[in-house]
Amino acid sequence: MKALVINYGVGNLYSISSALKRVGFEVTIDNKPRNDYDLIVFPGVGAFSAVAEFILRYRELFNDLRRSGTNFLGVCLGMQIMFEKGTEGKESNGLGWFKGIVDKINANVKLPHIGWDLVFEVKDSCELTYGLDKKYVYYVHSYVAYPTSGDYVYMKSQYGIEYPALVCDKNVVGTQFHPEKSSNTGKIFLENLKGWIKR
């Protein structure tokens, strides 16, 4: 099973690439999306506005790949870029695959939020969430998605406010947490992801 990790030109992609390899993916890192992969990964590095500029160059190709059935995983910022807009840096358009805006955590808490927190299911479980309910996952973020619909929110976490931890719609899945830093829970999720791709 082949995965393409998109290189936005910022950040270290080693962790997510290594985690995918550990569960059996063949991983390529490239800055151009292609249609000959089982999974395309938007990693969790950079700022929303900077990544939005990169995404804009390939927006139609990403949309075409999604419509053709290519599977996508977005991690942290990679999940956030799948929403309509983000305010980090400056207000910028995302891909719009999920309805809602990405904004700073609106609570009197220390930011960035770094560390372990529980995830909990908010909808009937899907293949992606098996074994994850009430388990600890790792976060590094100051911004969260504020969706206009809960239809695609399968898991949440809480840090001052409740926010989406895992979203999914057809062939697109996003996690606010970092599976590559979430120890055994992250490995469980990535194993689930392989099964979800084979569905």
Swiss-Prot record:
Reactions the enzyme catalyzes: 5-[(5-phospho-1-deoxy-D-ribulos-1-ylimino)methylamino]-1-(5-phospho-beta-D-ribosyl)imidazole-4-carboxamide + L-glutamine = D-erythro-1-(imidazol-4-yl)glycerol 3-phosphate + 5-amino-1-(5-phospho-beta-D-ribosyl)imidazole-4-carboxamide + L-glutamate + H(+); L-glutamine + H2O = L-glutamate + NH4(+)
Cystine connections: none
Pfam families: GATase
Pathway participation: Amino-acid biosynthesis; L-histidine biosynthesis; L-histidine from 5-phospho-alpha-D-ribose 1-diphosphate: step 5/9
PROSITE patterns the UniProt entry points to: GATASE_TYPE_1
Subcellular location: Cytoplasm
Domain Glutamine amidotransferase type-1: 2-199
Matching InterPro entries: Class_I_gatase-like (IPR029062), GATASE (IPR017926), Imidazole-glycPsynth_HisH (IPR010139)
UniProt entry keywords in alphabetical sequence: Amino-acid biosynthesis, Cytoplasm, Glutamine amidotransferase, Histidine biosynthesis, Hydrolase, Lyase
GO biological process: L-histidine biosynthetic process
UniProt GO MF annotations: glutaminase activity; imidazoleglycerol-phosphate synthase activity; lyase activity
Active-site residue list: 76 (nucleophile), 178, 180
Alphabetical list of SUPFAM superfamilies matching this protein: Class I glutamine amidotransferase-like (SSF52317)
Major localization listed first in the record, in broad terms: cytoplasm
Any one GO CC term of the record: cytoplasm
EC code(s) of this entry: 4.3.2.10, 3.5.1.2
Subunit-level organization: Heterodimer of HisH and HisF.
HAMAP family in the cross-refs: HisH
Known role: IGPS catalyzes the conversion of PRFAR and glutamine to IGP, AICAR and glutamate. The HisH subunit catalyzes the hydrolysis of glutamine to glutamate and ammonia as part of the synthesis of IGP and AICAR. The resulting ammonia molecule is channeled to the active site of HisF.
Protein name: Imidazole glycerol phosphate synthase subunit HisH
Organism encoding this protein: Saccharolobus solfataricus (strain ATCC 35092 / DSM 1617 / JCM 11322 / P2)
